[in-house]
Amino acid sequence: MSPPAPEQKPQLQQQQQQGSSSGDSSSGSANDSKSVTPAPSATSNTSQSSTAPSTSSDDNLICRWNACNQKFPAPEALYEHICERHVGRKSTNNLNLTCQWNSCRTTTVKRDHITSHIRVHVPLKPHKCEFCGKSFKRPQDLKKHVKTHADDSVLVRPSQDPQGGLNYRPQPPKGPSSYYDHTGQMRTNAAAFAHQAGHPSGGYYAPQPSTNYGLYFNQPPINNARTEHLGYSAAAGGYDRKRTYDMVDDFFGSAKRRQIDPSSYAQIGRSLMPLHGNLSVPNGPMTATEQYMPQPAPAPVHAGPTPSKTPSAQQYYLPMPSARTQKDLIHIDTILGQMQDTIYENANHATAGVHIHHAENGFNGYRNTPSPPTSHRSPTGMHVGADGYQPVSAASMASPLTAISSTGTPAVTASSSMSYTSGHSPSPSSSAMSPQSRHGSTASVMYPTLPTSLPAVSQGFGHSATTTLGPSFDGSERRRYSGGMLQRARAGPLPLPHEDTSGASTPKASESALSVGSPSSESDVSDATREREEQYDRWLENMRVIETLREYVRGRLERKEFVDDNESPRSSHSDAMDVDPKSPQAPPRELGTPREGSSLYPILRMPGA
């Protein structure tokens, strides 16, 4: 009597389903499918008879692999059945890399590929979006979908609180957040809710504390009305600052390996070009600009991590192998001093013909640093004056050779590490020796001339010809010839304007009107003026970058932020990139061979030394 029972039970349930509503039929069919689900060893006829009244949603849970037609209660069970039963494994010698779902016939080369392909046929969507709650079958599909939310907010790591990153505008989730994240770990309820009332007032647009890298700067709100711009600019600050430190380290390495000639202004300008506008490693924060323009965060000049509120947050250290030991820093400071002297020697050519305003106009009138006279620069490159938000063009800046401070010293002084023995070092008594400072009006400064001889000065300076305008350093021929050759080369095209000015004592009215109204002459003058201003800006930026690098190196030397030469790399707080394969108990090196931490370029030993 027991065999006909399974046949009567489905018939009674079919009659009940015909008289019920559509909603009840779906629920009844689900219960029916669960109650009569046969074992894997059951025949296919029983499974076909039980799945006949099923809806389209239940049809998706039927295995269509080579007419298997086995039904499963959940997508996970169906997926596991296909992977274990039909795909198989190489270890059991039954691996099948061809998809036989209906008429798919997709062939792969690895088991992982076909198991990922099976998700297309199985209604299994375990990967949910944390922003909108939408589910996806494969992780790569979720990754593509997550990129659509990038224009609304800055993405954070799934394991972190969405409010913990540097979000510009945190977006609350549109749907219920998933219980599991991408890694399968359970999440707390705090990540599924929007901004709570317990946060500080006005913090919706404010930058959030960084938990990603130690290079990120957690800027405090300066002005509540403009803090949204600060949060937006701080989002990508970590990558830019890491890139800046990499460029500085490359520059230090090239300078130590003598790939840059310290006496060649052209090579120095090319090597410093990537650092123009990107160098932001001051020892202290910028001043007098907080009320007008948001300033980027000054990067920490030490190699330690930045404090973070999350103890388990990932910290990032600043590796700089080229400036690791004290000898490296001293060597780099010496090379930077030579480069600074070379840049200063080319001030006459960089500032020749630039129309300037003297310090009496109120801009940069009083200065205490030896840096070139300039206004503060905002992150966008605009000039911000010390007394307010006032854009200043390059033409309105004071010339480094004519701007004299209140004490009588020139605005730009040479490096303190090099002592000038000739009469070409700018000083209070010799400041009138500059060709530009000897003209009375700004109109005559456009075309300066080089004197045939320099006047005698009471401090021991002798007469000098124009061919010897250059520093008298040591016996280096390359150093001595660089100044004189550059000065003679740039003085070639200057006699043409002097002929015009000398013959302009009795000009005709028609000629003067023609020269003023000619568009070709105006365009030539404007192009030449623009080129001179650009050349002056490049020279000024080179001087700023060199001074900033020297301040950084000197600051590390003063704070003793370097690795001791006698200290082993394991006991030092160096980065993983600085690991030395040599053992700390290695025998001492022979005399004449460089130790670890010394300069990177090879040292040529003289015979008999």
Curated annotation (Swiss-Prot):
Keywords on record: Activator, Cytoplasm, DNA-binding, Metal-binding, Nucleus, Repeat, Repressor, Transcription, Transcription regulation, Zinc, Zinc-finger
Keyword Iron assigned: no
Primary location recorded for the protein, binned into one broad class: cytoplasm
Compositionally skewed regions (Polar residues) per UniProt: 405-414, 438-456, 502-513
Biased composition (Basic and acidic residues): 143-154, 562-581
Disordered as annotated region, ranges: 1-58, 143-178, 294-314, 405-531, 562-609
Function (record text): Transcription factor that mediates regulation of both acid- and alkaline-expressed genes in response to ambient pH. At alkaline ambient pH, activates transcription of alkaline-expressed genes (including pacC itself) and represses transcription of acid-expressed genes. Specifically recognizes and binds the consensus sequence 5'-GCCARG-3'. May act as a negative regulator of virulence to plants.
Family: Belongs to the pacC/RIM101 family.
Protein name, per record: pH-response transcription factor pacC/RIM101
Annotated organism of origin: Fusarium oxysporum f. sp. lycopersici (strain 4287 / CBS 123668 / FGSC 9935 / NRRL 34936) (Fusarium vascular wilt of tomato)
Gene for this chain: pacC
